[in-house]
């Protein structure tokens, strides 16, 4: 995913010709940060999500997903703003999330670039719109359809319709893991 994303990002930068401030937005869990140690622990101890999740996040021990750190450093070097949009709890998890990202050398891990789920957030769309206020959002990264767009209703049919609608963007503007 990240290797092809680098090629796509270069295309977007070239196409932009310096006209707009460019940004990319990434989900955190299983896209930037690897939580397989938590998943393994939960499996061995017969726990189901979200049991133990908050404690895992607070431990700030997740390592980057393979290729994420290198790609993000590349995007940073190219002058692209990086935003992390996650459904982690804004009140409980912001400090630990920022600490984890910084410890792993993930660029632009400042609070203004880590957009976690607040009490009133129903979806990630409102946080994507925050980025789009003063940026051209050229790429989205995630491991779930909801990291890219929000279905009007949570049915298999509405998800299939969204996939059909956006299928030409997958692998280009929308990188799915």
Task: Please state what every model-predicted region is.
Residues 54-83, 90-91:
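Short, acidic loop-to-helix structural element flanking the phosphoryl-transfer center
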Residues 26-28, 142:
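Active-site flanking residues adjacent to catalytic metal/cofactor-binding acidic residues
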Residues 10, 14, 38, 73-81, ...:
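Sec-exported extracytoplasmic/periplasmic mature domains
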Residues 19-21, 79, 135-137:
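A general structural motif
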Residues 1-26:
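Non-catalytic pre-domain segments flanking phosphatase-related domains
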Residues 3, 19, 58-66, 88-95, ...:
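Soluble non-cytosolic domains of exported or imported proteins
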Residues 89-177:
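C-terminal cap/substrate-recognition subdomain and adjoining C-terminal extension
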Residues 15-21, 32-63:
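Active-site neighborhood of HAD-like aspartate-dependent phosphohydrolases
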């Amino acid at each position: 995913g990240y290797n092809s994303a680098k090629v796509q990002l270069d295309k977007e930068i070239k196409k932009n010709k310096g006209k707009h401030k460019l940004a990319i937005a990434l989900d955190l869990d299983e896209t930037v940060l690897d939580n397989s140690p938590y998943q393994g622990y939960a499996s061995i101890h017969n726990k189901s999500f979200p049991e133990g999740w908050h404690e895992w996040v607070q431990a700030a021990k997740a390592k980057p997903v393979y290729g994420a750190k290198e790609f993000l450093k590349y995007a940073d070097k190219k002058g692209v703003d990086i935003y992390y949009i996650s459904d982690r709890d804004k009140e409980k998890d912001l400090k630990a999330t920022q600490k984890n990202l910084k410890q792993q050398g993930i660029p632009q891990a400042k609070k203004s670039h880590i957009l976690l789920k607040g009490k009133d957030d129903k979806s990630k769309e409102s946080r994507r719109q925050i980025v789009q206020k003063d940026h051209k959002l050229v790429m989205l990264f995630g491991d779930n359809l909801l990291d890219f767009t929000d279905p009007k209703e949570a049915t298999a049919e509405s998800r299939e319709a969204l996939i059909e609608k956006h299928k030409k963007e997958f692998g280009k503007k929308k990188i799915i893991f």
